[in-house]
């Protein structure tokens, strides 16, 4: 707990949640009554399924019965439209559809969210502000993104295996006034066992981030910019080009004008070529008759490649591998073999206490 509080300069930390989704459930439980109304990003705008309404199978709606209203989104800026969203909140309040909770953060997160811009209206109506930092927590802790707890968030959740490179686990950070409610949400609310082996791994990851995190996250961001630029130069359409593509580890690519045309096909074909990315909805996909099965986008991240010691030149090589598969439609088996050969030079974990053990080795303790 002390390591988490130190890394994020938080008044309170609970390291018991066994995942980021469980951390979000703890946050909802501490901040709202069952059935209360909240604001969150839609999935097509980068929101996570744990933020979604019941008819989409979302955790907030199905498990807690929350009525989820979506932020008004600026597709061009790929971010929340502040003025339009404030107008929406006021309109809902005036109709009697009271908003209790404002949630920022998401699973597609190239640019910081406008947290501080909503603190005034949150205070006006007595709303609590939450922030799901699952994908960007390592960047936040190292001072490389935004600082939600200083910008107005009351509670911040995270998972521990993305830009914060630890085991699969979760954490809730908050102002001290929410500590008791969060602790009750953890136990007896959510868990009778919080997987102590992963808590130990989380502690090691936090200690490593406190020592190596600034260098690690700086390179993550350089690599994300480099990969985005290399793909752009090869003819890919990247979201946020006019804003420098990204300010996080995440890159979002519209692949509808490539020969493969949809994100599912790109995802499957790149996996056959030993390149792991994931398909992703774009804000305008629904208008074009697309859904999660055939989305118009793909999402890429640079956390793991950076952890393996890759830098900007390697991002250019990766962009070329992707181009050979998606644009040039070269033989996938040939590209897969070339990727495997390329990867042989990157088998050690960097920015860590142990730089000698192979990254994917099965450790033996006996």
Regions found by a protein language model. Give the residues of each.
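A common structural junction motif
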Residues: 273-277, 326
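Residues in well-ordered beta-strands of folded domains
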Residues: 69, 252, 278, 301, ...
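N-terminal entrance/gating region of PLP-dependent enzymes' catalytic architecture
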Residues: 1-2, 6, 357-361
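Conserved PLP-enzyme active-site core in the AAT-like
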Residues: 3-13, 18-237, 255, 302, ...
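Short acidic (Asp/Glu) and glycine-rich catalytic loops that position anionic groups and cofactors
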Residues: 179-184, 199-209, 243-251, 294-302, ...
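Conserved small-domain helix->loop->beta segment predominantly found in fold-type I
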Residues: 206, 217, 221-267, 277-294, ...
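Active-site lining segments that contact anionic ligands and/or coordinate catalytic metals
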Residues: 167-169, 246-250, 267, 272-274, ...
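PLP-dependent enzyme catalytic core of the Aspartate aminotransferase-like
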Residues: 222, 289-366
């Amino acid at each position: 707990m002390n390591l988490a509080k130190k890394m994020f300069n938080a008044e309170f930390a609970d390291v018991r949640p066994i995942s980021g989704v469980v951390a979000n459930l703890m946050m909802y439980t501490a901040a709202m009554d069952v059935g209360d109304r909240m604001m969150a990003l839609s999935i097509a705008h980068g929101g996570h399924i744990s933020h979604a309404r019941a008819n989409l199978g979302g955790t907030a709606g199905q498990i807690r019965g929350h009525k989820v209203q979506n932020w008004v989104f600026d597709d061009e800026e790929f971010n929340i439209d502040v003025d339009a969203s404030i107008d929406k909140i006021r309109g809902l309040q005036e109709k009697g559809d009271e908003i209790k909770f404002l949630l920022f953060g998401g699973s597609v997160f190239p640019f910081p969210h406008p947290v501080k811009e909503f603190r005034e209206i949150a205070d006006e109506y007595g709303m609590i502000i939450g922030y799901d930092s699952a994908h960007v927590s390592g960047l936040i802790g190292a001072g490389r993104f935004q600082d939600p707890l200083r910008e107005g968030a009351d509670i911040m959740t995270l998972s521990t295996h993305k830009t914060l490179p630890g085991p699969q686990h979760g954490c809730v950070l908050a102002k001290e006034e929410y500590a008791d409610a969060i602790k009750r949400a953890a136990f007896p609310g959510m868990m009778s066992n919080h997987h102590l082996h992963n808590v130990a791994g989380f502690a090691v990851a936090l200690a490593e981030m406190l020592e190596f995190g600034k260098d690690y996250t700086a390179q993550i961001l350089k690599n994300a910019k480099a990969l985005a630029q290399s793909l752009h130069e090869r003819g890919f359409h990247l979201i946020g080009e006019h804003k420098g593509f990204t300010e996080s580890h995440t890159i979002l690519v519209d692949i509808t004008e490539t020969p493969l045309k949809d994100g599912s096909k790109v995802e499957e074909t790149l996996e056959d070529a030993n390149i792991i990315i994931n398909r992703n909805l774009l804000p305008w996909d629904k208008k074009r008759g697309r859904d999660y099965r055939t989305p118009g986008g793909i999402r890429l991240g640079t956390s793991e490649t950076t952890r393996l010691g890759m830098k900007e030149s390697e991002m250019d090589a990766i962009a070329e591998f992707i181009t050979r598969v998606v644009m040039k439609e070269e033989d996938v088996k040939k590209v897969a073999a070339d990727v495997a050969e390329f990867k042989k030079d990157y088998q050690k974990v960097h920015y860590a206490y142990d730089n000698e053990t192979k990254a994917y080795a099965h450790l033996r303790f006996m």
